[in-house]
């Protein structure tokens, strides 16, 4: 749709003309579906007129600018927002013909685990359901290039596209740790692609505006650090996997982050202050650590102690460690920590 808008040089007068032509041909009122409409200047004024005339309108787009304050003011209270994410694991299973009931852990466990291995590595974009093997990675690579050159480089008139690509790779390599603007600028510049901190800030905003990535703030930090020292995650595991040689642990945390972001939105944080907890929900009193395995004694001690120490400092009732395949209950004094494999957590918490 966006290519059509660009080629035709559309504006709101063209949209009004399409509406008039329809009304001359048909007597019943249409339902409007406007895809990637943000390409059309002042599109929100056209949509406001439709809403005032009691038309039903669906507007979709892949840029967060659609939700800016100016547009919200023009539309008034005449809209509801629905974020669309890649398939959840349950949706992915359903699309592959796997239907789960309350006893699925006994009936479908092996089938669920087999499908999860593919979902984990290639993500939940619907088009991948019809791709096989290596075709999945080729399709993901083509999709990323389309987003990179179309939604990023062309839309924002980026001249230093190689620096942007290096930044994306560095963010992928750093997906489990906070990254300050200065650190990212130094990482990119160290590859020979000189870049300023201000440009890094612009590029990060572009990546979030186009839904390639999202960020989490540190609940325990001061306001200035909340803004400048965030953790960055990719909206889909498949895109992240394109940039990693050994992706397992990063994919695990990224998948948990996407799932929690979908469920809790802006209420989701990480917690870093004298301890490191991957995900923290103040409103739900939840704390979640992500660890590929707890078999190493030092890893187990680190992950468990971080949750217990957090529980001493803030109100938290639900303590959880999400692993790749391990499951148990850890009891420490009055606190119980659930250890759950990610594929089960995805389905139990959704169901």
Residue ranges and their predicted role:
Residues 1-5:
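Short, small-residue-biased leader/transition segments that mark boundaries at the very start
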Residues 10-12, 38-47, 69-70:
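Conserved ATPase-coupling elements of RecA-like P-loop NTPase cores
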Residues 26-41:
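Conserved P-loop NTPase "ATPase switch" module shared by AAA+ and STAND
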Residues 44-59, 73:
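Conserved catalytic/switch belt of AAA+ P-loop NTPases
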Residues 64, 69-178:
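Interdomain motor-coupling "hinge/lid" segment immediately C-terminal to the ATP-binding subdomain
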Residues 129, 133-287, 292:
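Accessory nucleic acid-recognition modules appended to NTPase machines
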Residues 272, 314-333:
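Nucleic-acid nuclease catalytic cores
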Residues 325-351:
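Domain-level recognition of nuclease-like catalytic cores that cleave nucleotide substrates
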């Amino acid at each position: 749709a966006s290519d059509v808008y660009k080629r035709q040089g559309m504006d709101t007068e063209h949209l009004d003309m399409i509406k008039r032509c329809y009304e001359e041909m048909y007597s019943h009122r249409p339902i409007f579906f406007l895809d990637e409409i943000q390409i059309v200047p002042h599109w929100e004024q056209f949509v406001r007129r439709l809403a005032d005339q009691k038309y039903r309108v669906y507007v979709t787009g892949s840029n967060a600018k659609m939700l800016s304050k100016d547009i919200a003011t023009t539309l008034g209270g005449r809209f509801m927002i629905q974020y669309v994410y890649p398939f959840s694991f349950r949706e992915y299973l359903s699309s592959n013909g796997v239907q789960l009931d309350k006893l699925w852990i006994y009936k479908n466990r092996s089938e669920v685990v087999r499908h999860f291995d593919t979902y984990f590595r290639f993500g939940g974009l619907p088009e991948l359901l019809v791709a096989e093997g290596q075709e999945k990675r080729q399709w993901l690579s083509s999709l990323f290039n389309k987003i990179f050159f179309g939604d990023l480089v062309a839309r924002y008139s980026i001249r230093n596209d190689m620096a942007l690509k290096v930044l994306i790779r560095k963010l992928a390599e750093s997906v489990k740790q906070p990254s300050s603007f200065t650190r990212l600028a130094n990482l990119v510049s160290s590859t020979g692609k000189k870049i300023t901190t201000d440009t890094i800030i612009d590029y990060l905003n572009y990546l979030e505006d186009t839904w390639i990535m999202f960020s989490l703030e540190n609940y325990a930090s001061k306001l200035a650090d909340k803004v400048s020292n965030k953790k960055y995650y990719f909206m889909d595991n498949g895109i992240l996997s394109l940039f990693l040689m050994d992706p397992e642990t990063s994919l695990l945390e990224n998948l948990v982050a996407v799932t929690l972001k979908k469920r809790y939105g802006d209420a989701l944080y990480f917690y870093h202050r004298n301890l490191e907890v991957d995900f923290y929900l103040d409103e739900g009193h939840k704390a979640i650590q992500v660890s590929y395995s707890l078999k190493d004694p030092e890893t187990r001690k680190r992950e468990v102690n971080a949750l217990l120490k957090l529980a001493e400092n803030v109100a938290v009732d639900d303590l959880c460690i999400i692993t790749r395949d391990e499951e148990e209950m850890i009891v420490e004094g009055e606190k119980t920590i659930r250890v759950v494999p990610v594929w089960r957590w995805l389905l139990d918490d959704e169901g």
